[in-house]
Amino acid sequence: MPADPYPRAVLDLLAAAGDRPVIEHGTRTVTGAQLLGLVRRLAAGLRAAGLGPGDGIAMMLGVTPEAFAAMIAGYAVGARVVGVRPGLPGAQARHVLRQDIAAIVTDADPAQGALTVAELLETPDDGGPLRLSGRPHDVARLVHTSGSTGTPKGCAQTYAAMDAAWTARPAAWPPAIKELASRLQRYLVFGSLASQVMMEYGVLTLAAGGTMVVADKPAFPDAIVEHRASASVITVPRLYRLVAAQRAAPADLSSLRALMVSGSPVEASRLREARDVLGPVVFHGYGQTETGTISMATPSDVPPSVGFPPDVIDVEIRDPDGVPVPAGTDGELYVRTPAQAIGYWADPGETAEVFAGGWVRTRDLGHFDDDGRLYLVGRTRDVIIVNANLHYAGPIERALAASPDIAEAYVVGAPDEDTGEAVHAFVVPAAGRTPDVGSLRTLVRDRLGDGCVPATITVIDEVPSGPSGKPDKRLLEPPDRTG
C-alpha cells in the first residue's frame, strides 16, 4: 500500500493531466490542474469548517466539476463521504442524513446549517503540500443501496479498501478493464456522483487519459450524438430503448466505442441484438454495491457469460450448505475482494447475514464453465430490479397490506420492456371491502417511492397453494401487458 492514503492515486492523475481537459461541462472545460486546484481549495474549506478524520459529510450535489472535486476533497481530509442521490424519497433521505452526519455540502441555497460549494471555495489554498488525513481502517465512504427495504443500507468501504481498488492504477487493470479503458476518450457523465459506478468510471477515465463529458439530460441516443461521446454507462431498459430507436431511425453513433451495461442481467438474445445493431461496443458488467465490479464481459465474449473475474477477486459457487461446487453446477455466489465493503453502517444484523468470514454473500445464483467464465442464472433473494434498482417484495407487500381494504398482499416481478423488470401485485380484499387500485398505488409511492409502485394490481380471492399447503406466490402469473 502506498505511504499516502486514498485519494493520492487520484490526485497524482490530476497532476499528471496538467493542462489536458479532464471535464467538459456545457461550454466550460476544466483541466487536470484546474480540477486539482478545486480539490485543494475545497479541502481547505472543509478543514476550516472543522471537518476531518471520521466525520460524516453528506454530499448533496449535482454533476459538476465542483461536485467531483468536493468528493475527492472529502477523502483528502479523511472524512466519511456520503453521496446522496437526488430524488431520494423524504423518509429515506432523512434516514441517510441521520447516520452520524457532521455536515451537509450542497451546490447552492443550503438548508439551515449546510455548507455550499461556493462558501468552501472562499478558503484560499495555502500553496503547501496537500495533507491527506485518511486512516486505513476508517470508513472512507458510504454507498447506499436503493432503499427498497424501507431504509437504504449504507455499504461502508474503508480507506484501505479504496486504495486497493484497481480503478486509478493502470498497472492493476485486468484485461477486460484494460480494453474498456482504451475506449474512454469521452466518457458521458450524468445522473449523480453518488452513483458508485458513475464515480468510479470517472476515475477510470482520468487514468485512461480521457475526458468526462457532463450531460444534463441523459437521453439516448441524443446525448451521445450531441457530446460525441465515446463511452457511457447504460441501464438495461435504456439499452433496449436505444436499440429500438436505432432500428427505427438510426442516429450517428460513429463516436461510440463502449456502452457499459450495468444494474441488472441482460437476456442473451437481447445482448446479441444490441451488438448486432450498435456494433462491437457493448460491455456487460456484473457487480454489487458491496463488492464493486466482480466481472465484465467484453464485446467479444459470447452471451450469456459475464466474463472472467480478475485474479484479485475470489469467487466461490456454493451449495445451500455452504460447500463449494464444481464447474457446471449452479449455486450461490460468494465473493471476496480487497476493495469490498466491511459491512452496512450501523446495521450489525444485516452485516452478519451478508458479510461473514471475509466473504460477501451475493444471493445471486450462477456457475463457472470449465474455462472459468462466469454465468448468472437467477437470484436467491425475493427482489425485483426496476430501472437497475433493487426493490424487495416484502416491504411492498407490507405497504399494501397496511390498507384497511386488504387482507393479504403478494408481489412478484416479471420482465418489462421499459424498466427491465416490473412490480406486479396480487391482493386479497378484506371482508366486505372493495380495494381502490389508485389509492393502493399512492400508498406504496408515499411509503417506498416511485420505483416500488406496482405496474399492475390484481384482485384475487386467494393465493394458490403449493404442495406443502402454504401460499405459493410463484404460481401467480402477472397480466400480459405486451398487447
What do these predicted ranges mean?
Residues I104, T337, I342-G343, L365-C452, ...:
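AMP-binding/adenylate-forming catalytic core of the ANL superfamily
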Residues T31-A33, A140-T167:
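Conserved AMP-binding A3 loop
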Residues W166-R186, S192-A231, A245:
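Conserved AMP-binding/adenylation subdomain of ANL enzymes
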Residues M1-P5, A118-V139:
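Flexible, low-complexity linker/hinge segments
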Residues F308-V312, V323-V354, N389-H391:
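Conserved ATP/PPi-binding loop(s) of AMP-dependent carboxylate-activating enzymes
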